[in-house]
Amino acid sequence: MSDYKNTLNLPETGFPMRGDLAKREPGMLQRWYEQDLYGMIRTAKKGKKSFILHDGPPYANGSIHIGHSVNKILKDIIIKSKGMSGFDSPYIPGWDCHGLPIELKVEQLYGKPGEKLTAAEFRIKCREYAAEQVEGQKKDFIRLGVLGDWDRPYLTMDFKTEANIIRALGKIISNGHLLKGAKPVHWCTDCRSSLAEAEVEYYDKTSPSIDVAFHAVDAAAVATKFGVTRFNGPVSLVIWTTTPWTLPANRAISLHPEFAYQLVQVEGQCLILAAELVESVMKRAGITHWEVLGSCKGADLELMRFEHPFMGFDVPAIMGEHVTLDAGTGAVHTAGGHGPDDFVISQKYGLEIANPVGPNGCYLTGTHPLLDGKFVFKANDLIVDLLREKDALLHVEKLVHSYPCCWRHKTPIIFRATPQWFISMDQKGLRKQSLEEIKGVQWIPEWGQARIETMVANRPDWCISRQRTWGVPMSLFVHKDTEQLHPRSVELMEEVAKRVEQDGIQAWWDLDAADILGADAADYVKVPDTLDVWFDSGSTHSSVVDVRPEFNGHGADMYLEGSDQHRGWFMSSLMISTAMKGKAPYKEVLTHGFTVDGQGRKMSKSIGNTISPQDVMNKLGGDILRLWVASTDYTGEIAVSDEILKRSADSYRRIRNTARFLLANLNGFEPSTDCVAPEEMVVLDRWAVGRALAAQQDIEKAYANYDFHEVVQRLMQFCSVEMGSFYLDIIKDRQYTAKSDSVARRSCQTALFHIAEALVRWMAPIMSFTADEIWAFLPGKRAQYVFTEEWYDGLFGLAEGEGMNDSFWAELLKVRGEVNKVLEQARADKRLGGSLEAAVTLYADSELAERLNSLQDELRFVLLTSGARVAPLADAPADAQAAELVKGLKIAFSTAEGEKCPRCWHYTTDIGLVAEHADLCGRCVVNVAGDGEKRKFA
């Protein structure tokens, strides 16, 4: 028997079967950098329509975590897919570099400013530390395969950006949105600074829950409001609070004007309570006997006076719509210095806004002899004892409730009225305008719109001033006596900005006011406050996007961050852009969920369920991480575990194997000379190219809609079902056994070439490393990198009018599936070896039979059997198996007649008819020694 191996077109490629990504990817990154791949993309896309995804800056502190990876990979997928879609989409990564976390790290290393280092030296150390952190994070982001201008990122501590942040505030001032006031703000006693809403987290805290009696100054006068003239003991208005430490600042008691209140006689005293809450108050106070003496509306008690239990003065009853009946007594202890609602109602009544608490959370001297110098939370028990001593404590118990805490220290914070600078929400209609702007933005997912609308509608004025060392200075001058802003503030801020642009923020602290104020310097002082870091990042639409030349003044199309940024970066950016320019800074806002483990639990070092992106890349490679991100519905929680990543690795292998099959069978194919014209191609090959066209249309749409999990699903379906389970199986015989330069083989290679050209582009935004690797093995002249290209435009499909159209092949795919079931069962029963040992008879109704017969002798190649014939359904024997998914079809098989051809492995009766090739079948003789077999359909 002759060895016919050399007459076969066996697959061959240098493209490795194993990805070995963890080892191979770093070398690819090095090549991308050395050859300036990002610059090549910019050159290739120059002049195209712009799409700008503006990078929300991560904080320059610590290593990146899995959530960072999700964020950056999603951005990179969008940027690359937009490039494939014909957009010029530059990506400028950024970092948030000022603020408290960096200060705290530098304090740990060098001490607080003014101790071992001057404030100026401290800022230098902060700048150096932030720069180190940026470099560390940058390496990890690059390792993810994210392409961007990594050599020229934007940093909020860049001198020019710092200057532009000052200019942004100047514009807001000129538009009339800045105000100064002593308002209660979130205050961290550890930071000794105010906090933004986005810097507040909520944790469970145990607090004393107390009911406190404020005795009426004129009990008889108050009782008459209830129509009561006879009562026993003092008359007291009862408040409920979980913050006893705020009682020294109490200046009023708020009642709802429309609620019904009752005067309730208990043993030895009368209590005023909301009618609906009497029973619940009595129950928790352990009072079993009481009598309702009379009722009145809250409005009837307005300005009645009640004695403060321990401060030695009396306070009025005032009316407030913020009072509810959800809990408590229906009377709200009101301290304007310790709560936003209290502040508003106190201002309305012209009450003192008392603030007896210092920056460190301790009572100021002169507050109360027992409390002076005490830390507020430690004073709670002292105040409870004081109330008990004054016979003003009706009830006390411990309550576990959700309480605001500092995002950095995780410690409880307080509301504290301090002189601060605010962006006013209503002074010049900023709230109303922002709500209008929200409507013009596309929110992905849609629920994001309602979420941010609620936040904007209910948010207080934005406190933008901070009492910190490492931050952009507000750069304001105020009059020594009136504390009013200098009338030329905006002009002066531009002078400061010019200096900061040259020398950084230290220029402000080095500035002698006389240098720019002249004679006015005697009457004005520099404001020492720095800006909230959310102002830094929130103004990057102006300080970065508007000034970077590669953006061409286009403005941002998209912001993309985690869902916590509705109250963070999305909010601050919207406020600043609307205050500056009267419009939103973005056209689309996409949010993703947080990462959780396989059981849906939050990632936590204490639980031990964290997954490090660095570990994943070192073990599995960046493309596995990228494929996992793309495979997930990012709009909800994003689950990750070793098992989930293993599934992503399995999916990756299926896609890689498909690509390798394509490349291996393009061996010896030169597109410029070997491509077969569509009209001359085998019908099945044209169908395969048409399936690629349909897949590409779906994939392009999914990319455009940011449905990346749909991209992956469609990619997997194409590779596994349409290609792997059908087309690639069928063509092996023709590809391997046909004459190497025959139309039958070149038609197949033409299809594989078109499919590979499309597939590598579909993969590129997600599996970037592997796409680059595939690109290098594709035949024909081409650009150096797939990332400079657009979606492949060489695909074509079957004409709908053709008899063998898409519907025909879809039906045939089902028929083949039914045949496979029958043959697989026979193999399981040991009645059959390989499918080529079988000859199949398809008993079909007349319409199906006509379609199947149109394939003539080539039906057997589609079914991967040595024989196939079609017979009338009525002739089906009893043992023929009815198809489950194809109507009018029964299947039977028998062992194929003849001998096995050693070259094509088909069983046939025509072996040995040609003496020179006595062991070959007639078909193989034609392919080895003749003109090659002709294929028309498959």
Curated annotation (Swiss-Prot):
L-isoleucyl-5'-AMP binds at residue 561. Zn(2+) binds at residues 901, 904, 921, 924. A motif ('KMSKS' region) lies at residues 602-606. GO terms for biological process: isoleucyl-tRNA aminoacylation. ATP binds at residue 605. One of its GO terms (molecular function) is isoleucine-tRNA ligase activity. Its EC number is 6.1.1.5. A motif ('HIGH' region) lies at residues 58-68. Its cofactor is Zn(2+). It is found in: Cytoplasm. GO terms for cellular component: cytosol. It catalyses: tRNA(Ile) + L-isoleucine + ATP = L-isoleucyl-tRNA(Ile) + AMP + diphosphate. CDD domains: Anticodon_Ia_Ile_BEm, IleRS_core. Its main location: cytoplasm. Belongs to the class-I aminoacyl-tRNA synthetase family. IleS type 1 subfamily. Monomer. IleRS has two distinct active sites: one for aminoacylation and one for editing. The misactivated valine is translocated from the active site to the editing site, which sterically excludes the correctly activated isoleucine. The single editing site contains two valyl binding pockets, one specific for each substrate (Val-AMP or Val-tRNA(Ile)). This is Isoleucine--tRNA ligase. It comes from Serratia proteamaculans (strain 568).
